[in-house]
């Protein structure tokens, strides 16, 4: 039985990647190295900009993270697509947290803006997810806006992130 909490540790998130958090039919997070979250600091079914659900999570930045050695040589920066993927990861996690079943798949994003970067000298990345709408019919789908902050400064914004849960991924 899933124990619903308002926050989750790295160990909890790793258990999710193994399918041990939401059960065999629930969504999973990716495993390291693609897991872009170290902890979830707050989850609510209300709150956020639209009062329809909110998630706050963090990633601790270390200069030895895998992407800094290849993106780019002599000009290391965290790929922006990893921050976007982290926001999709959190939308999918939230869908499992509210009881959704199935495998999570990113379905799109309307708009992404990058106004800063994550360098090896950064300390903490914070993700803020503001849910706009949750659909719980045949397809479970979350729609949200997101922000990525680096050391307390907003550096990415995403409008209309979409993630769906599929009980049969061959139909996706």
Swiss-Prot record:
Belongs to the thioester dehydratase family. FabA subfamily. One of its GO terms (molecular function) is trans-2-decenoyl-acyl-carrier-protein isomerase activity. Its main location: cytoplasm. Gene3D superfamilies: Hotdog Thioesterase. It catalyses: a (3R)-hydroxyacyl-[ACP] = a (2E)-enoyl-[ACP] + H2O; (3R)-hydroxydecanoyl-[ACP] = (2E)-decenoyl-[ACP] + H2O; (2E)-decenoyl-[ACP] = (3Z)-decenoyl-[ACP]. Homodimer. GO terms for biological process: unsaturated fatty acid biosynthetic process. It is found in: Cytoplasm. The lineage of its organism: Bacteria, Pseudomonadati, Pseudomonadota, Gammaproteobacteria, Enterobacterales. Necessary for the introduction of cis unsaturation into fatty acids. Catalyzes the dehydration of (3R)-3-hydroxydecanoyl-ACP to E-(2)-decenoyl-ACP and then its isomerization to Z-(3)-decenoyl-ACP. Can catalyze the dehydratase reaction for beta-hydroxyacyl-ACPs with saturated chain lengths up to 16:0, being most active on intermediate chain length. GO terms for cellular component: cytoplasm. Pathway: Lipid metabolism; fatty acid biosynthesis. Keywords: Cytoplasm, Fatty acid biosynthesis, Fatty acid metabolism, Isomerase, Lipid biosynthesis, Lipid metabolism, Lyase. Its EC number is 4.2.1.59, 5.3.3.14. InterPro entries: FabA (IPR010083), FabA_FabZ (IPR013114), HotDog_dom_sf (IPR029069). The active site is at 71. This is 3-hydroxydecanoyl-[acyl-carrier-protein] dehydratase.
């Amino acid at each position: 039985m899933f124990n619903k909490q308002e926050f989750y540790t790295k160990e909890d998130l790793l258990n999710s990647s193994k399918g041990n958090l939401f059960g065999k039919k629930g969504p999973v997070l990716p495993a390291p190295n693609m897991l872009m979250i170290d902890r979830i600091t707050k989850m609510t079914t209300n709150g956020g900009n639209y009062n329809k659900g909110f998630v706050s999570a963090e990633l601790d930045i270390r200069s030895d993270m895998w992407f800094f050695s290849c993106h780019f040589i002599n000009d290391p920066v965290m790929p922006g697509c990893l921050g976007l993927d982290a926001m999709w990861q959190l939308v999918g996690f939230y869908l499992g947290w509210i009881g959704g079943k199935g495998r999570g798949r990113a379905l799109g994003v309307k708009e992404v803006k990058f106004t800063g970067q994550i360098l090896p000298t950064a300390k903490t990345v914070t993700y803020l997810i503001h849910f706009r709408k949750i659909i719980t019919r045949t397809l479970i789908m979350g729609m949200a806006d997101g922000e990525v902050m680096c050391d307390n400064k907003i550096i990415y914004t995403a409008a209309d992130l979409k993630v769906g849960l599929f009980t049969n991924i061959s139909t996706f």
